[in-house]
Swiss-Prot record:
Encoding gene per record: rpl803
Protein name: Large ribosomal subunit protein uL2C
Main location: cytoplasm
Note from the entry: There are 3 genes for uL2 in S.pombe.
One Pfam family matching this protein: Ribosomal_L2
Cellular compartment(s): Cytoplasm; Nucleus
Lineage: Eukaryota, Fungi, Dikarya, Ascomycota, Taphrinomycotina
PROSITE patterns on file: RIBOSOMAL_L2 (PS00467)
Any single GO BP term: cytoplasmic translation
Keywords: Cytoplasm, Nucleus, Ribonucleoprotein, Ribosomal protein, RNA-binding, rRNA-binding
Any Gene Ontology CC annotation: cytosol
Domain of life assignment: Eukaryota
Subunit structure: Component of the large ribosomal subunit (LSU). Mature yeast ribosomes consist of a small (40S) and a large (60S) subunit. The 40S small subunit contains 1 molecule of ribosomal RNA (18S rRNA) and at least 33 different proteins. The large 60S subunit contains 3 rRNA molecules (25S, 5.8S and 5S rRNA) and at least 46 different proteins.
Organism: Schizosaccharomyces pombe (strain 972 / ATCC 24843) (Fission yeast)
SUPFAM superfamilies according to UniProt: Nucleic acid-binding proteins, Translation proteins SH3-like domain
Keyword Cell cycle found: no
């Protein structure tokens, strides 16, 4: 008879996002007539930190083209952006760092960030610190553009989808080790409830299938079938492969 493991006994409430002191959604401008047919100019007011986010944010002020007021947008800051910088958004904007253009207007090989999946969704791809998207090629007949994502995967997006020229600021953030549990505590408390995480082999057998024994070891294969029962479904679930990659790919000089 199976045991009810600790994760099942623990249960848990509905997750509530840690949004205290967050600065709001980081998005491009709403797509309008000015961006579709020309460009609009904004100025970077300040660069700020957003709790729980690795990349800094930039507050960019635009004059509203239809009403007598100033609209302040929150952009994901690109590397090299500074306060007082002019940012141009639109089809006819120049190809300089920080400007927002449709991907179809940029040449192949351009490095961009915060790219839209669909025109007008205000940014979805390449948004974390140090990340960027590379334009691979354009298909004029279908109006599509092929881009390379930070993961290395290729994706096809509409040529009318917008992106910010340059890479996201804050690169190299993970190069500095945390070193202390206190730093990890403060890092994850503003993100989500995912730290600390106890290993299964450190538990008792009543708490986890990997627990127990006179020394810490699993004692059986860690791969489990997809159809495993709850409480048994721990470890490498329905793994296609396990272990280290053996051998090296042949490289032509």
């Amino acid at each position: 008879m199976g045991r009810v493991i600790r994760a099942q006994r623990k249960s848990g409430g509905i997750f509530q996002a840690h949004t205290r002191l967050r600065k709001g959604a980081a998005q491009l401008r709403t797509l309008d007539f000015a961006e579709r047919h020309g460009y609009i100019r904004g100025v970077v007011q300040k660069i700020i930190h957003d709790p729980g986010r690795g990349a800094p944010l930039a507050k960019v002020a635009f004059r509203n083209p239809y009403h007598y007021r100033t609209d302040v947008e929150t952009f994901v800051a690109t590397e090299g952006m500074y306060t007082g910088q002019f940012v141009y958004c639109g089809k006819n904007a120049a190809l300089t760092v920080g400007n927002v253009l449709p991907v179809g207007e940029m040449p192949e090989g351009t490095i961009i960030s915060n790219v839209e999946e669909k025109a007008g969704d205000r940014g979805a791809l390449g948004r974390s610190s140090g990340n960027y998207v590379i334009i691979v090629g354009h298909d004029v007949d279908t109006g599509k553009t092929r881009v390379k994502l930070p993961s290395g995967a290729k994706k096809v997006v509409p040529s009318s989808a917008r992106g910010v020229v340059g890479i996201v600021a804050g690169g190299g953030r993970i190069d500095k080790p945390l070193l202390k549990a206190g730093r990890a505590f403060h890092k994850y408390r503003v993100k989500r409830n995912c730290w600390p995480r106890t290993r299964g082999v450190a538990m008792n057998p009543v708490d986890h299938p990997h627990g127990g024994g006179n020394h810490q070891h699993v004692g059986h294969s860690t791969t489990v079938p997809r159809q495993s029962a709850p409480g048994q479904k721990v470890g490498l679930i329905a793994a296609r492969r396990t272990g280290l990659l053996r051998g090296a790919a042949a490289v032509e000089n």
